[in-house]
Structure formats: C-alpha cells, structure tokens
C-alpha cells in the first residue's frame, strides 16, 4: 500500500449491528478513511447497506472475495467471537490491516496466533476497545496521574444489561457467547488501564493479578452473571462485574488513600461528569461528549498511513486475554 494515501479504504466482514450502527458511520465520518466494501452472506443485508450507505463501491457475498479485493487496505471484523481468529489470520494473509471487535480472540492462544500472523505479513492489528478514545477515559487517567487519590487500593468496574432477545448470538456457546466475552472484557481492560497508569503508563507495566477469585451463574452453557476479584502485588483489589440478567449498569469507582473517583457511563461517551471526593470536599469533573468510534477509526487509519503503532497496544490485548483465561478457568 502507498503510504502517501490520504485515506484508508475499509472493508467490513459481516453486516453486524455494531458495524451498521457504529463502525460504518464512523468510517464515513473519519477524515482519513472511506467505506469501500462490505461482505455479507445475506443478499438482503447487502441491499440494505447499499440503500443506507450511498456511494458504497463494492459488495461481496463472501468474506474471502472481499479479502481478494486489491483496493481494500484494512478490514473491520465484527463477526461472532468464535470467528475472530480465523478471519483475522485470513485477512493478514491477504495483506489487510485488521481492526477486530473485542474480544480479539476466545483465549490468549488465539490472540498470539493473530498477532503472529499480522506481524508475519507486515500488517497492523488492533482490538476495538472504543472507550479508550473518549474524553471520559482521558479524564480518568489525568486524575490517576495527578496523584490526588493517593495510593489506589480498590477498583470496582461493572458492565451489565438485561438481554431480552433469546435468539441472540451472545447466548450461543459455540459462537463464543457469554457475558464475560461480550461485556466483561471491558471492566477487565479498565482494571489493566488503571494498574498501568499507576505503574507509569506504559502498556502492560501494571502486570498481572497475583490471584483471582470468581463467582459465576451459568445458563444454557454460558455465563450470564459473572463477578471476579483480582488481587495485585501492590495490594490493589479490583472487583469486576458483568452480566446479561439484570438492569443496565455501566460504572466504575477508584478508591485511594486520599479520595474516591466515581465514573458513571465508564465505557460510553456522552457528555457528563466524574465525581471526585477528597476528604470532605466533593466536586464534579465535567467531560465532553466524544465521537469514540470515529476517533478509533482515525487512530488506526493514521497508524497505517504513518507506519506507527495504534493507541491501543497488542500488549494490552494479550494481557486482557490472559486474565480472562484465568477468570474463565476459575469459574468452572
């Protein structure tokens, strides 16, 4: 690919809801990207996409056909979790850069295989944790790095919602369903972000928990309610919660020796505020709305154009998978 290209031409493998509602519109808003091609095995979905996104250059009935398109520079993979590894590797073999939806793989072994394949073929790979591109996340990091909380001793992070669709692929174990894979990966990643910031900010610097404990409720072969406690060598205790079987809650809290930071809508990007309590003083830290998916697309596209690493690192992807492996093993 010519590094002087002003825009990265994107292909999308599958017309999943997140692609239709979030990523494809974000690609179209991005300054350095264009939505070039879509592959779906459903002709009805392709017709819908052509109507919804005028100017879509090419549509394909097979994923392999799209990967053979020489004009596609990068692909987004929003397929069911169990298909991420195989199609990421196939994309790399065709010389395509890959933004893969979280979780990148079902386990650390799959993630290593994906990373190795992308490195072997000289293409970029990034896991799509869009919350890392919000003003809210930047504000959290600024508070941690300021030291105003003192030494952080506890982290609580929750991402849950009530899943009302009994036919959802999120409930199918053979496709990589389950609450931990679907939404629990966010709190796990958030804890990693916090411990890295505490350790100086380098990806992976915060290391692994020294022990984990899990309680889990299962139904239909998947976890539907999942809570874990992670203990780190520093003495930090992190509690992560996720589930499909209760009212929506997305929040986090950091407790240090000097204060507490409350983070509503932790993984979303509306305008709002964090609440910082230091001693008896309580104040709000306003955060602006963020176009998180567009920023994610622009960062990855720029990383390709400038031949640099994207903001979200493969070291973090691998660590997240390793921690989730431990949590899943402890839940069985």
Question: Over which residues does each language-model region extend?
Answer:
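C-terminal helix-rich "cap/oligomerization" subdomain common to oxidoreductases
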Residues: 1-4, 74-76, 233, 285, ...
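Beta-strand-loop-alpha-helix segment that lines the small-molecule cofactor/substrate pocket
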Residues: 74, 80-132, 147
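Active-site loop of classical SDR/Rossmann-like NAD(P)-dependent oxidoreductases
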Residues: 18, 287-298
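N-terminal Rossmann-like dinucleotide-binding module
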Residues: 1-54
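Predominantly a Rossmann-like dinucleotide-binding segment in NAD(P)-dependent oxidoreductases
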Residues: 131-212
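Short polybasic amphipathic segments
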Residues: 252, 270-279
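Conserved SAM-binding strand-loop segment of SAM-dependent methyltransferases
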Residues: 56-62
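Contiguous beta-strand/loop segments that form the cofactor/metal-binding neighborhood of enzyme cores
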Residues: 4, 189-269, 287, 298-308
């Amino acid at each position: 690919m010519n590094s002087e290209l002003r825009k990265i031409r994107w292909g999308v493998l599958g017309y999943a809801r997140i692609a239709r509602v979030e990523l494809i519109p974000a690609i179209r808003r991005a300054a350095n990207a264009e939505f070039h091609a879509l592959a779906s095995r459903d002709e009805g979905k392709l017709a819908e996409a052509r109507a919804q996104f005028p100017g879509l250059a090419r549509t394909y009935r097979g994923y392999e056909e799209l990967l053979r398109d020489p004009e596609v520079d990068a692909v987004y993979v929003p397929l069911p979790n169990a298909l991420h590894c195989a199609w990421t590797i196939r994309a790399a073999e065709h010389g395509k850069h890959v933004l893969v939806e979280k979780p990148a793989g079902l386990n650390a072994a799959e993630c290593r295989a994906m990373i190795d394949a992308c490195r072997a073929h000289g293409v970029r790979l990034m896991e799509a944790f869009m919350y890392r591109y919000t003003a809210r996340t930047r504000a959290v990091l600024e508070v941690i790095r300021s030291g105003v909380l003192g030494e952080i001793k506890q982290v609580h992070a929750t991402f849950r919602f009530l899943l009302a669709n009994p036919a959802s692929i999120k409930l199918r174990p053979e496709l990589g369903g389950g609450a931990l894979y679907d939404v629990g990966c966010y709190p796990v990643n958030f804890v990693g972000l916090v411990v890295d910031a505490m350790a100086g900010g380098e990806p992976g610097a915060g290391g692994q928990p020294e022990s984990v404990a899990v309680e889990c409720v299962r139904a239909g072969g998947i976890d539907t309610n999942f809570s874990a406690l992670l203990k780190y060598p520093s003495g930090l205790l992190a509690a992560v919660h996720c589930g499909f079987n209760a009212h929506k809650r997305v929040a986090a809290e950091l407790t240090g020796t000097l204060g507490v930071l409350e983070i509503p809508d932790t993984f979303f990007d509306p305008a709002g505020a964090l609440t910082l309590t230091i001693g008896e003083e309580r104040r709000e830290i306003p955060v602006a709305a963020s176009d998180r998916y567009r920023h994610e697309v622009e960062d990855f596209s720029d990383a390709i154009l400038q031949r640099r690493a994207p903001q979200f690192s493969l070291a973090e992807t691998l660590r997240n998978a390793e921690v989730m492996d431990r949590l899943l093993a402890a839940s069985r």
